[in-house]
């Protein structure tokens, strides 16, 4: 599911600030960009970075590792494992990168509560949409549960639509 919070992105300032923070963290760690830091490098990063920069770096490093693992999980058809990664990514975006919003957090929690395999904020954050990995037979019930929960929490009723993953863009032989 794609869950549009109907919140306009407010990331002009927030996204620019996160970018500056990540660039500063990379500079202090002596790398070109944080994606170069392995998970094992986070312990060293904790000793070198101020707390906020460490949390930003931890999000980027751990999310990079999650993306790599997600490729393997999708190839093997492990949708439950993929769902766990999506949810872990959302927690990292919310807690370490601080780019989620209460409406999106509500949608993610409602999707998970309704049985989604996983859910997370998507895009640059600070508004926008989330996605939820849902079994086909649970699309309608999950959509209804999310819309109701978000509205009951005092946010605009989100626009929700079902999508299907595909092989992506490719070149015909």
Language-model-detected regions and their locations in the chain:
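Short beta-strand->loop micro-motif that forms the acidic, two-metal-ion catalytic signature
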Residues: 127-133
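C-terminal nucleotide
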Residues: 1-118, 133-173
């Amino acid at each position: 599911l794609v869950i549009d919070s109907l919140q306009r992105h407010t990331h002009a300032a927030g996204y620019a600030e996160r970018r500056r923070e990540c660039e500063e963290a990379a500079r202090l760690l002596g790398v070109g960009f944080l994606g170069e830091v392995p998970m094992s490098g986070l312990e060293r990063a904790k000793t070198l970075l101020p707390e906020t920069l460490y949390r930003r770096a931890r999000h980027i490093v751990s999310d990079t590792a999650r993306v790599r693992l997600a490729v393997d999980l999708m190839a093997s058809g492990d949708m439950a494992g993929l769902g766990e990664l999506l949810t872990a990514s959302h927690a990292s975006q919310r807690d370490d990168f601080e780019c989620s919003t209460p409406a999106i957090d509500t949608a993610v929690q409602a999707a998970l509560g309704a049985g989604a395999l996983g859910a997370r904020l998507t895009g640059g954050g600070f508004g926008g949409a989330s996605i939820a990995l849902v079994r086909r037979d649970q699309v309608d019930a999950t959509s209804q549960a999310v819309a109701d929960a978000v509205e009951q929490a005092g946010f605009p009723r989100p626009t929700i639509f079902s999508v299907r993953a595909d092989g992506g863009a490719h070149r015909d032989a």
